[in-house]
Amino acid sequence: MLGDKLINDCRIEVFGVTIEPLWVEAYCYDETHFPDYNTHRSRKQKNRFGQMYFHERGYGGVDICLSNSEDFCLSFLLKATLANGRFLTQTQLPRVLLSTGKTKADFEHLEDILHPANARHTICHTTRVNLTKPCYSDAPLTSFALDAIPKYDFRFARKNLRENVRAYLLAYMAAHPDCTEQECRAECRRVFGWVPDLVRTWVHN
């Protein structure tokens, strides 16, 4: 998936800021093949491969456009990143970028901002956060670095991560049939950084 490559194979270099994606969400609109109305359908999401797109809708944020055609929109929201080593959420990233003194237009005009990386994160997938429309709401269009989850503040994603935690926990219990609830909770905290309220139900059912 393109999201996996953005996280593991790319870093973003803009005006002295190095951005390492940790959680990215795909937004694509093709009238015939993928009519996702959660996508803004902005002209900045078309035919601007490798360029930034600042937006104000919803919570606001920054996307990377990966469309190379006027026929479809495709961009990835940078939902969580490291910027010069500092963890930032979707709403924090634009403020940090604009604190450089450059304008949104300055950033959006930049080309060749994607550079090779070799991050080697463990990549997982889930649904997108806080969608306003039902289309593709159950599709696993988010890619995220699993190993980053317990290290940083991913509270914004906990609702979407519940199914990932459940699947991981069921596999863990199958591999450790004698494990206790306490051990399962400790494993959840180790891998995901928190323990959902439903862990007790999952363990005892």
List the model feature ranges, each with a label.
Residues 166-205:
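Basic, alpha-helical nucleic-acid-binding regions used in initiation and control of genome expression
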